[in-house]
Amino acid sequence: MMRIVSIASTAAGRRLAERLPYPVEVGGAAAAIRSAWHKVDAIVVFLAVGATVRLIAPHLQSKQSDPAVIAVDEAGTTAVVVVGGHHGGNQLATEIGALLGASPIITTATDRRDLPALDAIPGFAAEGDYRGVALRMLEG
């Protein structure tokens, strides 16, 4: 089971966050993200994508260790996968979409084309140029 936290800085964000089945941190998003970063598998932030990117940028290390991050707009109309799409973010955005009536915004190329993500196959340890292989898969 994924460890997930919602972070809301405004009353509108808090109202939406409380509709989700995850613990809610209310207040300063920067401090809440810093506190949660190494403790959870996913962070749902009720902020614009640009603000979310600026807040998570100092914490980003690798696809394998960073939590998935979903940015939900304060109207609750979109759930954008910012990072971690292949590591639970895409599924989480879809679940949030169903719970809030929001559109999940998934931009990972393999998911958009129903192809397997080589770096997300359970038990598969990628060696060598797996990105080149993935690119060739996408090119057909």
Segments (PLM) and residue ranges:
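N-terminal basic/disordered segments at the start of proteins
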Residues: M1-G27
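A short, well-structured beta->alpha microelement
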Residues: P21-S35, G128-L135
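Short, acidic/small-residue loops that bind anionic groups at enzyme active sites
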Residues: K63-G84, L92-T107
